[in-house]
Amino acid sequence: MAIQHPDIQPAVNHSVQVAIAGAGPVGLMMANYLGQMGIDVLVVEKLDKLIDYPRAIGIDDEALRTMQSVGLVDDVLPHTTPWHAMRFLTPKGRCFADIQPMTDEFGWPRRNAFIQPQVDAVMLEGVSRFPNVRCLFSRELEAFSQQDDEVTLHLKTAEGQREIVKAQWLVACDGGASFVRRTLNVPFEGKTAPNQWIVVDIANDPLSTPHIYLCCDPVRPYVSAALPHAVRRFEFMVMPGETEEQLREPQNMRKLLSKVLPNPDNVELIRQRVYTHNARLAQRFRIDRVLLAGDAAHIMPVWQGQGYNSGMRDAFNLAWKLALVIQGKARDALLDTYQQERRDHAKAMIDLSVTAGNVLAPPKRWQGTLRDGVSWLLNYLPPVKRYFLEMRFKPMPQYYGGALMREGEAKHSPVGKMFIQPKVTLENGDVTLLDNAIGANFAVIGWGCNPLWGMSDEQIQQWRALGTRFIQVVPEVQIHTAQDNHDGVLRVGDTQGRLRSWFAQHNASLVVMRPDRFVAATAIPQTLGKTLNKLASVMTLTRPDADVSVEKVA
């Protein structure tokens, strides 16, 4: 299935605010977010079209929330299978670890299968909404140089024509073999797994059982995954001495599939590819006016499906900060918080993915025996079993420093964590997810109180200039009490009672939420003004030049 790029007339000497190297998922998400912020963006891709073979197969709740932030989630959902469980099986087929979280604190199912090329196509189509975003395919980045106030890119087209791009910033989303990262001599430390895996995708799923199974077979570990649109993926470890060419031969492919299918001859093969699993992390994510994101910054084994999702976290974290800097609303020191916040969590996800791979295919035979023995204990330790079932082992992003203002003990503070996204009731009676009411920018959310009460006129002006939405949350039965309305404040009803529980748990009545839905600060009305001043300083926010009109929200 070839996904052709839009018919774009080539031009020479492009001048933009942001150049993005790579039209993969991270580059396209960056382009969509920056596009809706009004930033002038150019995406350059060396291939002539999007990659059309499946790679990632797992998209989580945080990534779907990111899709929601750019208005694409409704187009993405048809290419997903929600509530997709992951089950580890012993060689005899006994399930010893069942990862099946049923929580939706961020508004979406926590684990989902998906077809990456179709979702990438949604994002490519998404950028066409913005006249300020252009995508140029068949453009190889041959060289680039940094100046004090810009980056110069030298491109070559498929016909050999040279083009020059001038950009204020360059975001490298050009994959694990990133030309940008290598040119800058940024160390990419880590390991490459000794064994490769062959991935086989089959149409008209011959099994059609739901979920994904990781079979810990000591002879040849394998994976069986149900994907949307009746696609079945099998992954088999390539054993020492085997080559991709050998495994592609019909008799050898038949032998592989006979492990998992009663009739390996009656299948509709889509493709087979051999992959090497790497675990590597760039030493730096920002080098002056160049920023690394996605696989250019970190790569990890596939076993927890977090490579794609980590890239989405990068895009969401970086895009809003870059937009503020370009718009003159923050100084470029804000961009230093991108590495400060994202690098440690990316490392944690790499470590988790490596551990999951070692459970599936232990490096030593005795480790597999130990795994099988320990797995029996899970049946007799319900708390431990729930720990896996509810996916509590997944390191949730929590930032201890960066673009946030924390006071008190970090361990129990909600600051630096993603804010929940329950359903809320609007004053017209509509019920929607919280982010839909907030929009794409900052929000100051108050439980029961007028969030403007503790702010000075100057502070209101400063935060309105950022597009901040001021939200008053009330019990749903109070949503139509007109006397509680305040100019410039959106009132929402707590449809599910989750917001009341959140504020009660964290002993706060106000939360400052960043555009990437992370909690930047908490306060009570009497401390909000002081907290916002400290937060503005930490984020290096600038003062608005002109008054911002007060919005009346009905």
Curated annotation (Swiss-Prot):
Keywords: Aromatic hydrocarbons catabolism, FAD, Flavoprotein, NAD, Oxidoreductase. Pathway: Aromatic compound metabolism; 3-phenylpropanoate degradation. One of its GO terms (biological process) is 3-phenylpropionate catabolic process. InterPro entries: 3-HPP/3HCI_hydroxylase, FAD-bd, FAD/NAD-bd_sf, PheA/TfdB_FAD_monoxygenase. One of its GO terms (molecular function) is identical protein binding. The keyword tRNA processing does not apply. Disulfide bonds: none annotated. It catalyses: 3-(3-hydroxyphenyl)propanoate + NADH + O2 + H(+) = 3-(2,3-dihydroxyphenyl)propanoate + NAD(+) + H2O; (2E)-3-(3-hydroxyphenyl)prop-2-enoate + NADH + O2 + H(+) = (2E)-3-(2,3-dihydroxyphenyl)prop-2-enoate + NAD(+) + H2O. FAD binds at residues 17-46, 285-295. The keyword NAD applies. It comes from the Bacteria. Catalyzes the insertion of one atom of molecular oxygen into position 2 of the phenyl ring of 3-(3-hydroxyphenyl)propionate (3-HPP) and hydroxycinnamic acid (3HCI). Belongs to the PheA/TfdB FAD monooxygenase family. HAMAP family: MhpA. NCBIfam families: PRK06183.1-1, PRK06183.1-3, PRK06183.1-5. This is 3-(3-hydroxy-phenyl)propionate/3-hydroxycinnamic acid hydroxylase. It comes from Escherichia coli (strain K12). The gene is mhpA.
